[in-house]
Amino acid sequence: MKKKKALPSLLYLVFIVLLPWGVSFSFNKCLELWIKNWWNTRQSETLLPYIQEKRILERFIELEELSLLDEMIKEKLKTHAQKPPIGIHKEIIQLVKMDNEDHLHIILHFSTNIICLAILSGFFFLSKEELVILNSWVQEFFYNLNDSIKAFFILLVTDFFVGFHSTRGWELVIRWVYNDLGWAPNELIFTIFVCSFPVILDTCLKFWVFFCLNRLSPSLVVIYHSISEA
């Protein structure tokens, strides 16, 4: 009876895994035009935010200094005093467009992520029975394996998440999260996360192996340590 109910639960799990991508793609297409119109209207009413103005002004000053240096070299200071170089105007327009696209990207992805989280939370809340059946089926499948295979899978999972090369993977994960949310990369946060999170996770896994798994199957713990120390 449990195995018959496990198949719908597995399909439900696959649906839950694929749902965020489908929702993200659909809502990105649906919300993009609406958010773009709303943002452009808001921009026309309130002009540029302070941070946006400051960043563009800094870039403008940098370009102006470069342009002045170029004009001094070419000895065309009179032309510069009468009319600013066309290149600066083009660069300013490009900066405004790029900054506007960055803000649209942040708002769009943040809205999509909130909607995905709400939908997934609703599915988890309304489908507790399927999750309970799936959890019991996975536990039954795991307990029916012999201790050597169990130790192999545990060692594989621990090395994958907290092994020697796992730091690079966690760095890619947090960079993907930042990019998906539209946040500016912060190397300090990346370094702190990569240095601390695998250590915390490794401590939790060791606690689970020593205190929880040892009560269920002491022989499994012995095999696990024998393989890991080999």
From Swiss-Prot:
The keyword Plastid applies. It is a multi-pass membrane protein. The chain crosses the membrane at residues 7-27, 106-126, 145-165, 181-201. Keywords: Antiport, Chloroplast, Hydrogen ion transport, Ion transport, Membrane, Plastid, Plastid inner membrane, Potassium, Potassium transport, Transmembrane, Transmembrane helix, Transport. One of its GO terms (biological process) is potassium ion transport. It comes from the Eukaryota. One of its GO terms (molecular function) is antiporter activity. It catalyses: K(+)(in) + H(+)(out) = K(+)(out) + H(+)(in). Contributes to K(+)/H(+) antiport activity by supporting proton efflux to control proton extrusion and homeostasis in chloroplasts in a light-dependent manner to modulate photosynthesis. Prevents excessive induction of non-photochemical quenching (NPQ) under continuous-light conditions. Indirectly promotes efficient inorganic carbon uptake into chloroplasts. Belongs to the CemA family. This is Potassium/proton antiporter CemA. It comes from Lolium perenne. The gene is cemA.
